[in-house]
Amino acid sequence: MIEPTQVMLQTTVGQQADAQALARLAVQGAWAACVHVEPIQSVYRWQGEVREDAEWRLSFKTTQERLPALLEALKAHHPYELPAFYTLSATPLTPQWAQWVQDAVDPSS
């Protein structure tokens, strides 16, 4: 079995330009191997009101080792007052893909 060393960190932003900027920052900084950027519709409670807004979901593919640096970079550049960050464990099903993620986030590469 392949070790579950990969994680997917997700967050949302309100503007496509912000999503693209965070995605590029993460990949250029070698904190994420890849980022999926998707338009979504969110329904949530904020300051006592139920709101519905278009947002952009970002799914960052990274490793356990690079996760702390990725999170710090995103917190420093996220446009929201209270951004949501959460992770999903990712167990790669092929060693080739696992190695690609590992190589892509290796700061010495």
What is the role of each PLM region?
Residues M1-S109:
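Positively charged, small/polar-rich N-terminal and surface patches that mediate targeting and assembly
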